[in-house]
Curated annotation (Swiss-Prot):
It comes from Shigella flexneri serotype 5b (strain 8401). Its cofactor is pyridoxal 5'-phosphate. CDD domains: D-Ser-dehyd. GO terms for biological process: D-serine catabolic process; isoleucine biosynthetic process. It holds the Pfam family PALP. This is D-serine dehydratase. The modification N6-(pyridoxal phosphate)lysine is found at K118. It catalyses: D-serine = pyruvate + NH4(+). Monomer. The keyword Lyase applies. The lineage of its organism: Bacteria, Pseudomonadati, Pseudomonadota, Gammaproteobacteria, Enterobacterales. Keywords: Lyase, Pyridoxal phosphate.
Length: 442
């Protein structure tokens, strides 16, 4: 971006200056609306989420047999919700900032099959595509026992088709493993940030991995191009896919059920704050949408990004969405949080969700490493750096009197609050890689 343009952008949006300086930044969204007012802009409804829920239930008998690790839950891919009181104390001590309410962790990091939040959206979109093909070919009806998809005739049928996706790692892992199991030929276009072990794991499942020296945006573009030339190839579009988004959104109802099981209340007197790491936006956007449908105006969602990749904060704050990238303002998009190394946000998610998100913040790689170490020490839970992005949220919210006033929170409401950090990945990180992460914390 030339200087004059840059200067006028900063004049209009002074916060951009802090982003350019790679400062840890928090922006509380002044334009949030009620769910009723914001919902029409999403372009999807409660019914769409129910349909996704039903589809995953139809596939449950198949998943229970296809992946032994889902047998115990009857083929439902869901993660644990745990309290992390020792980590809460550690954060309060390290940052000299009390966190009012209770701190919880949602362990999507340990979801079965692929060990990340992408096991929600990625697997769902592959299943939705497989179902569509099988229904159209007359090989399946909605009332069938879907475990029949494991038969050789279905494998044979699906092998005529292929799937392509661009990814920094975790989405590729989910889509690759699921597609290969069903019988699709699958190609994952991996950006330069992708970890070597993720590529190796995919190849071990018979997935074709194409590697790029460039970032996420290039990998997605190349994947899209490769798929266009083949009518039997289906491209899963992380930047714009409504299907992926709906796969994530099912998490809202599931979390509501987990809260009910644990006797946790969410209402006006007991607000829920949720902190979601954000890359291109599909995962956190879909989850936030599902949470809003489940808890209405009593849930407050925040997106967390690396200081080197603040694409969603930049896009929503300036209103330019996918018309601007972090590279345009001189930020390099290089971060240890490989899952969040995205320079240009999803225009669909930004525009759909901007009224329903309470805020956005950035944190440095070092902060993620520090918190990664503390969580391992205090709670014995090991995550990858990206998954710690949400962990900085509670102190930002508790420290901001202006945010609390904007939403009229009383001290008592904050004392009764639940702070939920969404841990997005790390359950499958190899030991030696994890030790390198742990060594970087302070």
């Amino acid at each position: 971006m030339e200087n004059a343009k840059m200067n006028s952008l900063i004049a209009q949006y002074p916060l951009v200056k802090d982003l350019v300086a790679l400062k840890e930044t928090t922006w509380f969204n002044p334009s949030t609306t009620s769910l009723a007012e914001g919902l029409p802009y999403v372009g999807l409804t409660e019914q769409d989420v129910q349909d996704a829920h039903a589809r995953l239930s139809r596939f449950a008998p198949y998943l229970a047999k296809a992946f032994a690790e889902t047998a115990a839950t009857g083929g439902i891919i869901e993660s644990e919700l745990v309290a992390i009181p020792a980590m809460q104390k550690r954060l309060e001590k390290e940052y000299q900032q009390p966190i009012s309410g209770q701190l919880l962790l949602k362990k999507d990091s340990h979801l079965p099959i692929s060990g990340s939040i992408k096991a929600r959206g990625g697997i769902y979109e592959v299943l939705a595509h497989a179902e569509k093909l099988a229904l159209e070919a007359g090989l399946l009806t909605l009332d069938d026992d879907y475990s029949k998809l494991l038969s050789p005739e279905f494998k044979q049928f699906f092998s005529q088709y292929s799937i392509a996706v661009g990814s920094t790692g975790n989405l590729g892992l989910s889509i690759g493993i699921m597609s290969a199991r069903i019988g699709f030929k699958v190609t994952v276009h991996m950006s330069a940030d992708a970890r070597a072990w993720k590529k190796a794991k995919l190849r071990s499942h018979g997935v074709t991995v194409v590697e790029y020296e460039q970032d996420y945006g290039v990998a997605v573009e190349e994947g899209r191009k490769a798929a266009q030339s083949d009518p039997n190839c289906f491209f899963i579009d992380d930047e714009n896919s409504r299907t992926l988004f709906l796969g994530y959104s099912v998490a809202g109802q599931r979390l509501k059920a987990q809260f009910a099981q644990q006797g946790r209340i969410v209402d006006a007197d007991n607000p829920l704050f949720v902190y979601l790491p954000c890359g291109v936006g599909g995962g956190p956007g879909g989850v936030a949408f599902g949470l809003k449908l489940a808890f209405g105006d009593h849930v407050h969602c925040f997106f967390a990004e690396p200081t080197h990749s603040p694409c969603m904060l930049l896009g929503v704050h300036t209103g330019l969405h996918d018309q601007i990238s972090v590279q345009d303002i001189g930020i390099d998009n290089l971060t240890a949080a490989d899952g969040l190394a995205v320079g240009r946000a999803s225009g669909f998610v930004g525009r759909a969700m901007e009224r329903l998100l309470d805020g956005f913040y950035t944190l440095s790689d070092q902060t993620m490493y520090d918190m990664l170490g503390w969580l391992a020490q205090e709670e014995g839970i090991r995550l990858e750096p990206s998954a710690l992005a949400g962990m900085a949220g509670p102190q930002r919210v508790c420290a901001s009197v202006s945010y609390q006033q904007m939403h009229g929170f009383s001290a008592e409401q904050l004392r009764n609050a639940t702070h939920l950090v969404w841990a997005t990945g790390g359950g499958m990180v190899p030991e030696e890689e994890m030790n390198q992460y742990l060594a970087k914390g302070r």
